[in-house]
C-alpha cells in the first residue's frame, strides 16, 4: 500500500511539474512579421521566436494558439492561456485588465493608402479606413478622427486585400506591419506621419499575463533583459525586420 501511495504522489508531482513548465501563449496569427501562419500551417514570426527564447531562459516549454484578437484578453482572464503575445500595445485601459511585461518593442502606428492618392490624414475625411476589430487603432480613429469611417476586420491581411482591390481607401495599423506591406507593394504608400499617441499606443508592445500573476511577469521580464543583453533579441529582430 505504501508503495502505491508513494507512486501516486510521485506521479502527481510529476504532472504538476510538467504543467508548471508549460506556458500557453495566445496570439492572433495574421499580423506578419510579428505572427502569421506559414506554408506548413505553423505559427511563426518575431513574437513566436522571442517567446521561444524567453521560455528557454526560464526552462519552460511554449505552446501557441491562434485566436481572434478581441478574444485574447478574455482567454487570459478565463485561464485558457497563461500569456498573450500578439503585437499588443501596453495602454492604461488594458493595464486595468491584465499585467504587462516591460516593453519588448517600441511601437507607433501609420495610415497607408493607394500611392499618390492621399498625402495627409485630413484627406481621409469621409473615407473608409480598415482596422482590426478590438485594437487601439480602431479606438484611436473613432475617438480622434470621427470624420473617418472605420471598417473593422478580423485580420489585417483581409484589410490589406480590400485596400489593394479598392474596396476601402486606407488601413491604419502598427508601423512595423504596414511598412512591410510597402516593401512588397509599390502601389501603396504611407499617408501622413507616424502616430505615437501614448494614450492609445502606450509605451510599446508587451506580453500580457493575468492580473496577480506577478511570478510569471517577473520571470518573463528577467528573461527579456537577458536576451537583450546577450544578443539573442538583436538576432531575432534582424531575422524579421532587416530583410
Curated annotation (Swiss-Prot):
Keyword Signal among record annotations: yes
Keyword rRNA processing set for record: no
Residues of the signal peptide: 1-19
Keywords: Amino-acid transport, Periplasm, Signal, Transport
Coiled coil: none
Function: Part of the ABC transporter complex ArtPIQMJ involved in arginine transport.
Protein name (Swiss-Prot/TrEMBL): Putative ABC transporter arginine-binding protein 2
Species, as recorded: Escherichia coli (strain K12)
Encoding gene per record: artI
Amino acid at each position: 500500500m505504501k508503495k502505491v501511495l508513494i507512486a501516486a504522489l510521485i506521479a502527481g508531482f510529476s504532472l504538476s511539474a510538467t504543467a508548471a513548465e508549460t506556458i500557453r501563449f495566445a496570439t492572433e496569427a495574421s499580423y506578419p512579421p510579428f505572427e502569421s501562419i506559414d506554408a506548413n500551417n505553423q505559427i511563426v514570426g518575431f513574437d513566436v521566436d522571442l517567446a521561444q527564447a524567453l521560455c528557454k531562459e526560464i526552462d519552460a516549454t511554449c505552446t501557441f494558439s491562434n485566436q481572434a484578437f478581441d478574444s485574447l484578453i478574455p482567454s487570459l482572464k478565463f485561464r485558457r492561456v497563461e500569456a498573450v503575445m500578439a503585437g499588443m500595445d501596453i495602454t492604461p485601459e488594458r493595464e486595468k485588465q491584465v499585467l504587462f511585461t516591460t516593453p519588448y518593442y517600441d511601437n507607433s502606428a501609420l495610415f497607408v493608402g493607394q500611392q499618390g492618392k492621399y498625402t495627409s490624414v485630413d484627406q481621409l475625411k469621409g473615407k473608409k479606413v480598415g482596422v482590426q476589430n478590438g485594437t487601439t487603432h480602431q479606438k484611436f480613429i473613432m475617438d480622434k478622427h470621427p470624420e473617418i469611417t472605420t471598417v473593422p476586420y478580423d485580420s489585417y491581411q483581409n484589410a490589406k486585400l480590400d485596400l489593394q482591390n479598392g474596396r476601402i481607401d486606407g488601413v491604419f495599423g502598427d508601423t512595423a506591419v504596414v511598412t512591410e506591406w510597402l516593401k512588397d507593394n509599390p502601389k501603396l504608400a504611407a499617408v501622413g506621419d507616424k502616430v505615437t499617441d501614448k494614450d492609445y499606443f502606450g509605451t510599446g508592445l508587451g506580453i500580457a499575463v493575468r492580473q496577480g500573476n506577478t511570478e510569471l511577469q517577473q520571470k518573463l521580464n528577467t528573461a527579456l533583459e537577458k536576451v537583450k543583453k546577450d544578443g539573442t533579441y538583436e538576432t531575432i529582430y534582424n531575422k524579421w525586420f532587416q530583410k
